[in-house]
C-alpha cells in the first residue's frame, strides 16, 4: 500500500451480545457502538477473540460486521477480524468485510493445523489478505490463544514483500522488546497496535500510539487519562492511573476473562447475555463477588467522575 494509516488512540475489541438461547443479539450492537463512541474510542475490532469470533458461524460473523459497520461507519475505524481455521473461509470473510465497508481486516494464524514456519504463515496471510485487496491487512499475533508463536519481525520482513496490502500487526503478547522492534521497523513504517491492556503505559513509553483492547469497552476513560498524563509529561500521574488499570485487570482475570468482562458490561447496563460453549457465563456468586471487588477499588465511582 502506498500510504499506511497510523492509529492514534484506543480501539475496542467488541463483545458479541447473545440472547439467553445463545443466538446473536444483533439489535444491541448499535447501542454498543454509541456507548463506545461516547467514551472517546477511536475504532472497533469486530469478531476477534473478545467477540467470540471463532465460536460464531460464518453467517453470524458477516451479520455482526454489517450491523457494527452500519452503526459506526465514518465515526469509528472499523477493523474486521477474519481469521478462521480454514484459509478459504477466512478469505470469504475478508471479501465480505470489504464489500460491507470495513476500513481494514485482520487475521490470526490458523489454530488447528498450525503454520510450520514464518514463511508458511506469510503464505497463509497472503491468501487471506488477497480476499480484500482494497483494505489494509493486519496480522493478529496472539500466541496465548493460537498456540503458535514465531519471530514477528521476521514475519514483517516477508509480509512487506509479498502482501501488497500489508499494513501492520495487532500485537497481543507481553514480549515488549519484540513489540518495540516491530513498532520501529523501517522507521516506524507500519501500524503496530498493542493488545495487552495492562501493559499500556510501558507500550506508550516505547512509542506506541494505537492499541486494541478488551477492557477498553468499559474502561476507556481510565486509559485515555493514562495517555493524557503521559503525553503531558506527567509520568507519576500516568503511573498512578495505570496502576489502577492494572488493579482492575487483576480483579477481572481472576475469572474467565471474556465471561467476566461481559459481566462488567452488564453491571454498566449492557446485558451481553451468555457466551458460546465452551465458554460459559459467570455463576451468580462469581458475578456478585466480581461486582464487590470492583466496587471496593472505586471502579464505578471513578468511571462516573
What residues fall within each predicted segment?
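A general structural signal for well-ordered alpha-helical segments in protein cores
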Residues: 29, 61, 65, 90, ...
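Surface-exposed amphipathic alpha-helices with a cationic face
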Residues: 66-73, 95-98, 129, 160, ...
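Short beta->alpha linker loops
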Residues: 82-85, 173-174, 195-198, 218, ...
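Ligand/cofactor pocket segment of small-molecule handling proteins
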Residues: 104, 110-116, 121-209
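Short catalytic-loop micro-motif centered on adjacent basic/acidic residues
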Residues: 78-81, 167-171, 212-213
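Active-site beta->alpha loop and helix N-cap motifs at the rims of alpha/beta catalytic domains
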Residues: 2-148, 304
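Short secondary-structure boundary segments
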Residues: 48, 109-110, 173, 196-197, ...
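Structured C-terminal cap/extension of enzyme domains
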Residues: 38, 201-305
Amino acid at each position: 500500500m502506498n500510504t499506511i494509516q497510523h492509529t492514534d488512540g484506543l480501539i475496542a475489541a467488541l463483545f458479541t451480545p447473545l440472547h439467553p438461547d445463545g443466538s446473536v443479539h444483533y439489535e444491541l450492537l448499535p447501542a454498543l457502538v454509541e456507548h463506545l463512541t461516547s467514551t472517546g474510542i477511536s475504532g472497533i475490532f469486530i469478531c476477534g477473540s473478545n467477540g467470540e469470533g471463532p465460536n460464531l458461524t460464518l453467517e453470524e460473523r458477516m451479520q455482526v460486521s454489517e450491523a457494527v459497520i452500519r452503526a459506526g461507519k465514518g465515526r469509528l475505524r472499523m477493523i474486521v477480524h477474519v481469521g478462521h481455521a480454514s484459509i478459504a473461509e477466512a478469505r470469504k470473510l475478508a471479501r465480505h468485510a470489504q464489500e460491507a465497508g470495513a476500513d481494514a481486516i485482520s487475521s490470526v494464524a490458523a489454530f488447528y493445523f498450525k503454520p510450520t514456519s514464518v514463511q508458511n504463515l506469510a503464505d497463509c496471510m497472503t491468501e487471506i489478505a488477497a480476499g480484500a485487496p482494497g483494505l489494509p491487512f493486519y496480522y493478529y499475533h496472539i500466541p496465548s490463544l493460537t498456540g503458535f508463536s514465531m519471530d514477528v519481525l521476521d514475519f514483517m520482513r516477508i509480509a512487506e514483500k509479498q502482501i501488497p496490502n500489508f499494513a501492520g500487526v495487532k500485537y497481543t503478547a507481553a514480549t515488549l522488546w519484540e513489540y518495540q522492534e516491530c513498532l520501529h521497523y523501517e522507521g516506524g513504517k507500519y501500524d503496530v497496535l498493542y493488545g495487552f491492556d495492562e501493559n499500556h503505559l510501558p507500550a506508550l513509553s516505547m512509542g506506541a500510539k494505537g492499541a486494541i483492547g478488551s477492557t477498553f469497552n468499559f474502561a476507556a476513560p481510565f486509559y485515555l487519562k493514562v495517555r493524557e498524563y503521559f503525553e503531558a509529561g506527567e509520568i507519576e500521574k500516568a503511573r498512578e492511573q495505570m496502576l489502577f488499570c492494572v488493579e482492575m485487570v487483576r480483579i477481572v482475570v481472576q475469572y474467565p476473562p471474556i465471561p467476566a468482562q461481559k459481566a462488567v458490561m452488564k453491571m454498566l447496563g449492557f446485558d451481553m447475555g451468555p457466551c458460546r460453549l465452551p465458554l460459559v457465563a459467570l455463576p451468580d456468586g462469581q458475578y456478585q463477588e466480581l461486582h464487590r471487588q470492583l466496587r471496593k477499588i472505586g471502579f464505578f465511582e471513578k468511571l462516573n467522575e
